[in-house]
């Protein structure tokens, strides 16, 4: 499985992307070496449940769809996505926080944004310790 995943990732475009759309797992891994990265994973049929993360500061924000034919299955498998939307936070290449929708296929926007902002603040504070 890992060999297949590595081969699949090698064939995907790694850095050619629109500003907020994930094209490969390698892209997130490269970006997250230096900064906080947040990836919101959803499905085309559930996009109305996306949370607007564009106002968050000090963190790169990306969206990914499990329906994307080139990489959707790889993302869902590699990141063990069980429901959509799922928001995953990375710091220096490691997952530090995950928010997953329940049976409603929605996340509580206010609670999630508060928790994400608190996590970003913690990341920023750690830079000065």
Question: Model-predicted segments: where are they?
Answer:
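Non-catalytic, surface beta->alpha helical segment in thiol-disulfide oxidoreductase systems
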Residues: 89-129
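Local sequence-structure signature of Cys/Sec-based thiol-disulfide redox active-site neighborhoods
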Residues: 21-62
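Short gly/ser/thr-rich secondary-structure transition/capping motifs
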Residues: 19-23, 66-69
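Active-site-proximal beta-strand/loop segments in catalytic clefts of secreted hydrolases
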Residues: 41-44, 66-67, 102
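Hydrophobic h-region of N-terminal signal peptides that target proteins for export
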Residues: 9-18
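Structural micro-motif
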Residues: 78-90
């Amino acid at each position: 499985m890992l060999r297949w995943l590595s081969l699949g990732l090698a064939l995907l475009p790694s850095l050619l992307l629109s500003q907020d759309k994930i094209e490969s797992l390698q892209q997130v891994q490269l970006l997250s070496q230096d900064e906080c990265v947040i990836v919101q994973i959803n499905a085309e049929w559930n996009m109305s449940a996306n949370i607007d993360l564009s106002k968050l500061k000090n963190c790169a924000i990306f969206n990914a769809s499990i329906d994307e034919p080139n990489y959707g299955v790889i993302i869902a498998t590699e990141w063990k996505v069980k429901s959509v939307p799922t928001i995953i936070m990375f710091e220096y290449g490691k997952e530090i926080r995950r928010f997953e929708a329940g049976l409603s296929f929605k996340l509580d926007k206010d609670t999630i944004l508060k928790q994400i902002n608190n996590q970003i603040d913690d990341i920023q504070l750690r830079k000065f310790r």
